[in-house]
Regions:
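Ubiquitin system architectures
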Residues: 1-79
Length: 79
């Protein structure tokens, strides 16, 4: 199994192709994404939506526990 995957991250105003590690917690991934693409934003509660697979991954989960693969379209959803 590969240690990284290439995904398309859907932001508010654009889609961005990024390479991410498979062994990362959702909470940490979203913090890193916000640091790079949305400085100054602090989210309270959120999850990842894997659009093309209909998956929702809670902030306390690890990506490696789910069938995320290269080519997936991902959105961050605040709840």
């Amino acid at each position: 199994m590969e240690q990284h995957i290439n995904i398309t991250l859907r932001l508010k105003d654009r889609d961005v192709d990024v390479r991410i590690p498979r062994k990362i917690e959702v909470r940490r991934l979203i913090r890193e994404i916000d640091t790079i693409f949305n400085p100054g934003i602090e989210r309270k509660k959120y999850l990842l939506r894997i659009v093309n697979k209909g998956l929702l991954i809670d902030e306390g989960k690890h990506l490696s526990d789910y069938p995320m693969t290269t080519g997936d379209l991902v959105e961050i959803e605040e709840i």
